[in-house]
Amino acid sequence: MRKYLTTTTAMALALGMMSTAAHADMEAARAFLDTEINGLSVLSREEQEAEMQWFIDAAQPFAGMEIKVVSETITTHEYESQVLAPAFTAITGIQVTHDLIGEGDVVEKLQTQMQSGENVYDAYVNDSDLIGTHWRYQQVRNLTDWMAGEGADVTLPTLDIDDFIGNSFTTGPDGKLYQLPDQQFANLYWFRYDWFNDEPNKADFKAKYGYDLGVPVTWSAYEDIAEFFTGREIDGKKVYGHMDYGKKDPSLGWRFTDAWLSMAGNGDKGIPNGKPVDEWGIRMEAGTCNPVGASVSRGGAANGPAAVYAIRKWDEWLRNYAPPGAASFDFYQSLPALSQGNVAQQIFWYTAFTADMVKPKSEGNNTVDDEGTPLWRMAPSPHGPYWEKGQKVGYQDVGSWTILKSTPVDRAKAAWLYAQFVVSKTVDTKKSHVGLTFIRDSTVNHESFTERAPKLGGLVEFYRSPDRVAWSPTGVNVPDYPKLAQIWWQQIGDVNSGAFTPQEAMDRLAQEMDIVMSRMQQADERANVYGGCGPRLNEERDAEYWLSQPGAPKAKLANEKPQGETVNYDELVARWQQ
């Protein structure tokens, strides 16, 4: 499979020499197609060359222009920055610098440009979690109108928006596309397929718990499996039943805002997000654009029984079933720990880790066999006792091209050309083999991924399945993602230290979100900052009033640990493939 992963030195050198001339060049395009794409595309060679010729022609007015774009540092964006950006420059004559910085820094730069009006970057790869922010502030170019109007002459005829599997996540309530997906990855369940199929393990589990060891459908089963494996000896070493992280830092925030509460069953039914209450516990009534509160006393669910249950289970499992030291790990430390090979399962695992988890044993990965085939699989996330059919069941990250209105039109056009180049049908299949962050349906179904699927632990099967729509990013109920997201890690981080109980922490979190939203309401009423779609908080009422109403917030269950339920992984995949 090396042919899918290798970026050749010859290609880099060829493009480097051509880019110094900074002129549009079909010769450079052919070199790129020969050496880098090398037939790995959903398009025929003739169609690839036609796309490249279109880019050359469309870029002519901007030849020699220098533009800057920015994204977070993940494998997909490293490939864009190091390989695709130089290729684009060589082919079009537009000099593009693609900066790689931390995810939080991307948001900070974006906020700086939104607040100052100065053009910091010509385009951003920004999480679609900010769709509610962008739709309300109206400071980003709405791409639907852009493609039909000012940007029509630089919009790729073969872009095919309907081919993007995440375009619903980047569409506002007004039906307009605000961001163009560049990479996306889901948060799924990860487990040791080999251990789950071991006959002594299966027999011992069945004898103890009364049902089959398999992929947990429910959190009850996940907890039983975590308990079962923790302390068990496999291949001469002690193993653990769970992996997670708990360090009080910003990465702990998205551990929860990335739909952990909805996995437990917090919020209402609705795809891609619950209505009227979403997974953050923020209520926004149907047919309106004004959030009315996060606290149960205002009709929200951020501190309701389902949310508190979700935080309590995170804390308990981290203490009882994870390897020593996991509670002090941050997001970035948890992956290397998993590759040691002493953990049975992880309930909250990003598919962006796939590229690292299929590395060979020689690179320190103890979760593959000697041939490099994964000993693990990924599967749908289990759900908690408050979950109901029709609710989202997990999170999907969609990093998307975002162009602000404060960027001058000519620079926006040049940046739009680059954005389309790196997601084009010519390029996307090869890019997806490098980063494994699918954005196009045509790519997911390409024959090269059918061939590679056995080496990817279930990634291809998941993205080809109809279930993928139940994993979605943060939605439009969240009026200002940067302002509200930072509250989460600061409050929940105090649970694992023992400073606050889960209920106390979520009460504080919900109250602080309401305080911040009340300030947004004042700004919107005074100066139309959110276009009239800022919060309009409900008056507080007795919590029992809201808990007795249908839907979220949901009243506390008498039994939060019903009998566990599992499913056989191979049968699950077979259902997907029918």
Model-flagged regions — what are they?
Residues 221-227, 265-328, 372, 381:
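Glycine-centered hinge/linker elements that transmit conformational signals in sensory
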Residues 86-163, 198-200, 204-206, 344-345, ...:
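Extracytoplasmic "Venus flytrap"/periplasmic binding protein-like
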Residues 128-140, 144-148, 164-211, 223, ...:
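Periplasmic solute-binding protein
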Residues 26-61, 128-188, 281-283, 375-381, ...:
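Hinge/lid segment of periplasmic solute-binding proteins
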